[in-house]
UniProtKB/Swiss-Prot annotation:
Tissue: In stage 12 embryos, expression is seen in the amnioserosa and by stage 16, also in the central nervous system, predominantly the ventral nerve cord and brain. Also in embryos, preferential expression is seen in the ejaculatory duct and the nurse cells (but not the oocyte). In larvae, expression is seen throughout the nervous system and imaginal disks. Adult females show expression in the nurse cells and adult males in the ejaculatory duct.
Glycosylation sites: 88
Binding partners and assembly: Homodimer; disulfide-linked.
BP GO terms, sorted: central nervous system morphogenesis; glycolipid biosynthetic process; muscle cell development; negative regulation of hematopoietic stem cell differentiation; neuromuscular junction development; protein O-linked glycosylation; regulation of filopodium assembly
Annotated protein name in UniProt: Glycoprotein-N-acetylgalactosamine 3-beta-galactosyltransferase 1
MF terms (GO), sorted A to Z: beta-1,3-galactosyltransferase activity; glycoprotein-N-acetylgalactosamine 3-beta-galactosyltransferase activity; manganese ion binding; nucleotide binding; protein homodimerization activity
Residue numbers on the Cytoplasmic membrane side: 1-21
Keyword Translocase included in the entry's annotation: no
Keywords from the UniProt entry: Disulfide bond, Glycoprotein, Glycosyltransferase, Manganese, Membrane, Metal-binding, Nucleotide-binding, Signal-anchor, Transferase, Transmembrane, Transmembrane helix
EC number(s) on file: 2.4.1.122
Gene name, Swiss-Prot/TrEMBL: C1GalTA
Binding site for UDP: 106, 108, 150-152, 158, 181, 324-325
Membrane topology type: Single-pass type II membrane protein
Length: 388
């Protein structure tokens, strides 16, 4: 065999070897990518939780899995509905007249079609009056264009302008005033039931109570909070004009800032739990509260929640009021499960309505220890709650 033929065979073998190496590399990359995808989608949801930044309340800081909000657009057409012929809604109709609730929804132009209209088509229609607060008008939503910019840094400013608008135009149209986000789902009938004994002239507000930053606690913005008419009056007339009582610039977390303002004008942070000590306002979707160990005990929520909270079915009142981070599609699912699905042969008899309270009087709080916290910036609080 000549030297030239040996050289040619050597080059050929080297080429085949390089080709096999290249193919092996490609196969390895494909397998590695597939394994990585499998690992990501099989990892428990709590691995995606982000640490909470107490000075920034937002999606990236909350215990909400990113995949839960993928289908944000919701249905293009109204899903429709039907009446229940034998349904007895006498009490709900009575409360609709006696406990008037104005619901205002924090939204923005990019969410008008994506989120806000689905609030209007589902739970929003059960409010006595529904108003969308944005920075641009919208004929379908009848949205109010507030004189404030969009973005997280303007949420406090938008909240102030919203309540000023409500006080000027609608203060006598309702007894209670609910603020909710465009991804909050609210069972309005249950809220009326909770509010029924209270006078709207009592300076009080209710929601999911957190304990840092404000001595008496403050209500989570995402879960929604509801102010009495007197609370709105004090906020707009007494707190907002006074920079010593209320932050004048637009920066800051809106739920914390309004909590400080309301405390400064002696509006009480009420206890919204039921008689069994179960919560009614929730900052996450039902799954996150109902499934034990869904959230790591080191997650910020457990340090922020004001009252001791159980996991599992005991987490939540049978008369729960709100959940947060609800996608548009989930709103229709919840609407069906709550207002249409019926187990045959089981009739739910509502509890008797409680007695009315005098102006300034509150229901006694559940006697128990408030939760403690050791996180930076979170005040420790373990004294037994007192009857107000």
């Amino acid at each position: 065999m000549t030297a030239n033929s040996l050289l040619g065979r050597s080059i050929l073998n080297e080429g085949r070897s390089n080709k096999r190496s290249f193919v092996s590399l490609i196969v390895g990359l494909i397998v590695g990518f597939c394994l990585a995808e499998l690992f990501v989608y099989s990892t428990p949801e709590r691995s995606e939780f982000m640490p909470y930044d107490g000075h920034r309340h937002g999606d990236v800081n909350d215990a909400h899995h990113s995949h839960d909000m993928m289908e944000m657009s919701g249905p293009e057409q109204d899903v429709g509905g039907h009446e229940h012929v034998h349904e007895n809604s006498t009490i709900a109709e009575r409360l609709y007249s006696e406990v008037r609730v104005l619901c205002w929804i924090m939204t923005n132009p990019s969410n008008h079609q994506k989120k806000a209209r689905h609030v209007k088509r589902t739970w929003g229609k059960r409010c006595n009056k529904l108003i969308f607060m944005s920075s641009a008008k919208d004929d379908e939503l009848d949205a109010v264009a507030l004189p404030v910019g969009e973005g997280r840094n303007n949420l406090w400013g938008k909240t102030k302008e919203a309540y000023k608008y409500i006080y000027e135009h609608h203060i006598n149209d309702a007894d209670w005033f609910l603020k909710a986000d465009d991804d909050t789902y609210t069972i309005v009938e249950n809220m009326r039931y909770m509010l029924y004994p209270y006078s709207p002239e009592t300076p009080v507000y209710f929601g999911c109570k957190f304990k840092p930053y404000v001595k008496q606690g403050y209500m989570s913005g995402g879960a929604g909070y509801v102010l009495s008419r007197e609370a709105v009056r004090r906020f707009v007339v007494e707190a907002l004009p006074n920079p010593k009582l209320c932050k004048s610039d637009n920066s800051g977390a809106e739920d914390v800032e309004i909590g400080k303002c309301l405390q400064n004008v002696n509006v009480l942070a009420g206890d919204s739990r039921d008689s069994n000590g179960r919560g009614r306002f929730f900052p996450f979707v039902p799954e996150h509260h109902l499934i034990p160990s869904h959230t790591d005990k080191k997650f910020w929520y457990w340090q922020y929640i004001f009252y001791k909270t159980d996991e599992g079915l005991d987490c939540c009142s049978d008369n729960a009021i709100s959940f947060h981070y609800v996608s548009p599609n989930q709103m229709y699912v919840l609407d069906y499960l709550i207002y249409h699905l019926r187990p045959y042969g089981i009739i739910n008899t509502p509890d008797a309505l409680p007695n009315k309270l005098a102006v300034g009087e509150l229901m006694p709080e559940i006697k128990e220890q408030a939760t403690e916290s050791t996180s930076d910036g979170v005040s420790k609080r373990s004294a037994e709650t007192k009857t107000q």
